[in-house]
């Protein structure tokens, strides 16, 4: 059979959601013709478990390898650039490699805004807010077009960076600094799971709302006018409660966000920085259990390897 015949069989198998058979035919196609870009694309697609499932470490690695082949053969395939970047950062936690991946994508598609937004998001997650701000600013300086779905994300990233710029840079948690105050904050909260924003909202707003419902008839009186005033008061309380809850959510869960950053640092660099007592804590297990399976597998391999961070390491 020719490479094209195997490719067509792979497409048919993939449409029937028979991923193993699709992989078998697609691999035969690229063995015959190593530059069959469509077959490599099928390998990347079929290596992933599907929309409702998250890939294992092996599946993510296989899909990423095929995606690299696709962009090498067809550099203008933005879809594969996006897939590779998401696999590197979201599934595997390889933030350093993801930054370079998106930089390569920018060279191939200089007018595309997606690589810049993704770089800014990664830099913000790593605590490098200055660099993230520069990426976001370049979008506006170059008057680049944003998709409707990207506006809210860019606005959220910009707000995060603006708030960070108002803080002392020393307050920004840097996992590679052994004696940073952020480690002490993590230690204090390591035996408690993060508190959800909805729970904070209920704690703050429920007593006030109950009091308003009980007191409103006496204050505003019966009738339609009293009902309208009561509704406005409840609406104001809900909006105020949501704003306060959001603020307290960030403050109370800062140790959890710090630990999340430390975990991302470990998977990005392959170095172990989290102390053992924190690694076996309730907070660490809570966060790890909510990370993708591929991320969890990589984290365990890094811990087993036990490579400690040495010297005065700094991000470059």
Functional labels for PLM-detected ranges:
Residues 39, 80, 115, 148-150:
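TPR alpha-solenoid repeat register
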Residues 1-32, 42, 48-55:
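Alpha-helical segment of the N-proximal tetratricopeptide repeat
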Residues 192-265:
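Transmembrane alpha-helical hairpins and terminal membrane-anchor modules
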């Amino acid at each position: 059979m020719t490479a094209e015949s195997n490719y067509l069989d792979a497409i048919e198998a993939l449409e029937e959601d028979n991923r193993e058979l699709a992989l078998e035919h697609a691999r035969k196609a690229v063995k015959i013709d190593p530059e069959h870009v469509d077959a490599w694309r099928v390998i990347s697609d079929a290596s992933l478990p599907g929309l409702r499932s998250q890939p294992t470490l092996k599946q993510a690695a296989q899909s990423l390898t095929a995606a690299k082949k696709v962009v090498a053969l067809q550099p203008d395939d933005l879809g594969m650039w996006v897939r590779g970047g998401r696999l590197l950062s979201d599934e595997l936690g390889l933030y350093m490699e993801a930054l370079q991946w998106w930089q390569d994508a920018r060279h191939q598609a200089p007018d595309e805004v997606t690589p810049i937004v993704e770089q800014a998001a990664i830099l913000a997650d790593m605590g490098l807010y200055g660099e993230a701000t520069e990426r976001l600013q370049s979008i506006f300086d170059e008057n680049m077009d944003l998709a409707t779905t990207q506006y809210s994300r860019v606005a959220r990233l910009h707000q995060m960076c603006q708030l960070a710029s108002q803080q002392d840079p020393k307050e920004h948690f840097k996992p590679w600094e052994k004696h940073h105050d952020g480690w002490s904050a993590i230690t204090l909260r390591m035996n408690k799971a993060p508190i959800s924003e909805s729970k904070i909202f209920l704690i703050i707003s429920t007593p006030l709302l109950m009091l308003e419902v009980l007191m409103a008839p006496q204050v505003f009186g019966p009738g339609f006018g009293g009902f309208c005033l009561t509704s406005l008061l409840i609406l104001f309380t809900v909006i105020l409660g949501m704003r306060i809850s959001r603020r307290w959510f960030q403050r109370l869960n800062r140790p959890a966000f710090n630990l999340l950053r430390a975990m991302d640092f470990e998977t990005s660099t392959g170095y172990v920085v989290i102390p053992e007592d924190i690694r076996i804590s309730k907070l660490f297990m809570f966060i790890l259990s909510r990370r993708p399976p591929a991320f969890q597998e990589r984290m365990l391999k890094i811990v087993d390897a036990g490579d400690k961070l040495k010297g005065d390491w700094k991000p470059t």
